[in-house]
């Protein structure tokens, strides 16, 4: 029996990593928000690896924090290990990675949702949308409840028509044997949305008491842990190590002997899997020359014995998984607590979205997270906060927020998805960002916190601290340009001690800092600033001085790109009447509907000659539009 369950500004379907950020962003911006989830006990649950961050992903977490999101604060409060990656490399690729206490993380996120006054968390299974005049105005649940809203965000993760596969066994299910969402997926197809079928997988979990750690290598966290969030002031001191072991020749023989039972190779799995997170059977087949593969043993929390076997993602039968585990050093007597599995699910083809993550087909309907074809908690959360922000802005009749490729990895990801699409689960990589020296872990707040403040997601205190940090950096940069360091015996003696050629003449401090061996701490010791800089400000000064040439070069590239972005394309431009455009270009342009010449130039299949023709056509000022 249908009944009216309430009116809201924003409805969010799903309570995973995308749904959490979407709900909190919309609510904190003043929109009355309801989050509908099949199981409120599984809010923010980590169905796959118990970790947050890593290359590119860790930078996304910092960006979410800079915009006022929750993920960074939650992991800072619940990690069991923190590590800065790529410290021996340049600043563009450094990123934090945390091992999470997945149960504490989940509880922390549920509390954040419950504590938000503008947000209601409610159990419900959404089966269809309410569409009026090509606009989404609400949802209907399996109990007949009708929720009305001005914007709806779908963040259903891998639940849509989910199917778990373990060897010859397959059954309809969401991840971790949760109930799947079947009717909503069918409903989206009925509405005309094109869906893709993707697959992901997870490894077995084992009982930590049955591991012989003496046969593995300890992997400790950093002695001095750094936070993800700029608001975190106190770090957890007691960390728990991970452990490293390897597959063996016998492991590979077991896998080869059972490939006929692997759903990946038998044709049972139809969905496309993630390129950068292959199953162990896929690795053994594709890299047959490798004698072994790394296996990381990752504790799932402080109060559980379950250990996640990173690197052993598999959908082989349960009995084969048991034998594989016991072929690995340290795991000879291990007991499996949960088997690994593959899960197939439906995803929306993301070229059907505007850069705001609103669907082109139905106004007021947004999608975010794995439903858009991405993989990973961080990618999902990054989309979630943007969908939540843009849904709230739409409700408030304000201009949308679109992050450019030069503003953040979140901008890179969304542009890739809506412009190029993806034929496999999309993972963020530093190599996807052409301006990665500008999109560093250390400057996320400088790039994005002003935006968060303008949206009302960053408070006055934090914004004032950011303004002070900016002033400190600029003041110190100017001071270093003026201060002269003389070639005294004391200075040269210190330079010689660290293997640097002595000065023959006086140098400006900024010039000396450009030398690779010289740190800002050394300069500050030789010529102390009037007021000591914070560690974060000092780091910025050093990076901005040492990489000034490269940064300036990328800023020039950004300026050229922005000129193309400013050349807007009418939303309903009729590409079919433009003579000279290649047939493939017309097809792709009609599909993506780019908003600018810059975006059009990034579409696969649209060549420079097509862009030139398009530019000339638009600049004439007279162009044909399609009917609405």
Swiss-Prot record:
Q: List ligand-binding residues for NAD(+).
A: 273-287
Task: Indicate where this protein is primarily found.
Answer: cytoplasm
Q: Tell me, what is an example of a GO biological process annotation in this record? A: tRNA wobble uridine modification
Cite the binding residues for FAD: 14-19, 126, 181, 370
| SMART domains on file | GIDA_assoc_3 (SM01228)
| Membrane-spanning parts | none
Q: Name one Pfam family in it.
A: GIDA_C_1st
Where in or outside the cell? Answer: Cytoplasm
Give the highest taxon in the source lineage. Answer: Bacteria
InterPro entries, per the entry: FAD/NAD-bd_sf, GIDA_C_N, MnmG, MnmG-rel, MnmG-rel_CS, MnmG_C, MnmG_C_subdom, MnmG_C_subdom_sf
The cofactor(s) it depends on are:
FAD
Molecular-function annotations in GO: flavin adenine dinucleotide binding
Q: Kindly state which keywords UniProt assigns to this record, in alphabetical order.
A: Cytoplasm, FAD, Flavoprotein, NAD, tRNA processing
* Any one of the GO CC terms: cytosol
The UniProt family comment states: Belongs to the MnmG family.
| Oligomer and partners | Homodimer. Heterotetramer of two MnmE and two MnmG subunits.
Q: What does this protein do?
A: NAD-binding protein involved in the addition of a carboxymethylaminomethyl (cmnm) group at the wobble position (U34) of certain tRNAs, forming tRNA-cmnm(5)s(2)U34.
NCBIfam families in UniProt: mnmG_gidA (TIGR00136)
Protein name as it appears in the record: tRNA uridine 5-carboxymethylaminomethyl modification enzyme MnmG
Organism whose genome encodes this protein: Exiguobacterium sibiricum (strain DSM 17290 / CCUG 55495 / CIP 109462 / JCM 13490 / 255-15)
């Amino acid at each position: 029996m249908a009944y009216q369950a309430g009116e809201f500004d924003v409805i969010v379907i799903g309570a995973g990593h995308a749904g959490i950020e979407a709900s909190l962003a919309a609510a904190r911006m003043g929109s009355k928000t309801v989050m509908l989830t099949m199981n409120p006990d599984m809010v923010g649950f980590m169905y796959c690896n118990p970790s947050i961050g890593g290359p590119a992903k860790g930078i996304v977490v910092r960006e979410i924090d800079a915009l006022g999101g929750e993920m960074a604060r939650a992991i800072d409060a619940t990690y069991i290990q923190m590590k800065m990656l790529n410290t021996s490399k340049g600043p563009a690729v450094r990123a934090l990675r945390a091992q999470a206490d997945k149960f504490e993380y989940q509880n922390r996120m549920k509390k954040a949702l419950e504590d938000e006054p503008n947000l209601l968390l409610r159990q419900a299974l959404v089966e269809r949308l309410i569409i009026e005049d090509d606009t989404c105005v609400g949802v209907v649940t399996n109990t007949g409840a009708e929720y009305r809203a001005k914007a709806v965000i779908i963040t259903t993760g891998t639940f849509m028509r989910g199917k778990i596969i373990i060897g010859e066994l397959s059954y309809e299910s969401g991840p971790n044997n949760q109930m799947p969402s079947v009717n909503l997926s069918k409903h989206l197809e009925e509405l005309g949305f094109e869906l893709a079928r993707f697959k992901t997988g997870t490894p077995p979990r084992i009982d930590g008491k049955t591991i012989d750690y003496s046969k593995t290598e300890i992997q400790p966290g950093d002695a001095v842990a750094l936070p993800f969030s700029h608001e975190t002031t106190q770090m957890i001191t007691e960390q728990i190590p991970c452990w490293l072991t390897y597959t063996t020749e016998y492991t590979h023989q077991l896998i080869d002997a059972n490939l006929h039972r692997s759903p990946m190779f038998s044709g049972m799995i139809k969905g496309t899997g993630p390129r950068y997170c292959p199953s162990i059977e896929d690795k053994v087949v594709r890299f047959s020359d490798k004698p072994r593969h790394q296996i990381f043993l990752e504790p799932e929390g402080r109060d559980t014995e379950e250990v996640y076997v990173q690197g052993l993602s598999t959908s082989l039968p349960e009995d084969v998984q048991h034998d594989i585990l016991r072929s690995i050093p340290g795991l000879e007597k291990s007991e499996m607590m949960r088997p690994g599995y593959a899960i197939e699910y439906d995803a929306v083809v993301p070229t059907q979205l505007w850069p705001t993550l609103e669907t082109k087909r139905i106004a007021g309907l947004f999608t975010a997270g794995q439903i858009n074809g991405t993989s990973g908690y961080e990618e999902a959360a990054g989309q979630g906060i943007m969908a939540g922000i843009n849904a709230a802005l739409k409700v408030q009749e304000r201009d949308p927020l679109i992050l450019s490729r030069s503003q953040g990895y979140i901008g890179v990801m969304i542009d890739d998805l809506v412009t190029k699409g993806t034929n496999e689960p999309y993972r963020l990589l530093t190599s996807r960002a052409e301006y990665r020296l500008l999109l560093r872990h250390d400057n996320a707040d400088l790039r994005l916190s002003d935006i968060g403040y303008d949206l009302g997601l960053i408070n006055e205190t934090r914004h004032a601290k950011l303004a002070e940090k900016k002033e400190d950096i600029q003041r110190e940069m100017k001071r270093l340009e003026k201060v002269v360091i003389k070639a005294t015996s004391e200075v040269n003696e210190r330079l010689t001690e660290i293997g640097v050629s002595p000065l023959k003449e006086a140098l400006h401090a900024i010039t000396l800092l450009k030398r690779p061996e010289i740190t800002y701490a050394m300069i500050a010791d030789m010529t102390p600033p009037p007021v000591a800089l914070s560690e974060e400000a000092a780091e910025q000064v050093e990076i901005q001085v040492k990489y000034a040439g490269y940064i300036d070069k990328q800023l020039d590239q950004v300026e050229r790109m922005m000129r193309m972005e400013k050349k807007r394309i009418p939303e309903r431009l009729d590409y079919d009447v433009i003579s000279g455009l290649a047939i493939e270009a017309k097809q792709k342009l009609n599909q993506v509907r780019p908003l600018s010449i810059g975006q059009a130039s990034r579409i696969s299949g649209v060549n420079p000659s097509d862009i030139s023709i398009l530019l000339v056509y638009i600049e004439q000022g007279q162009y044909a539009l399609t009917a609405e």
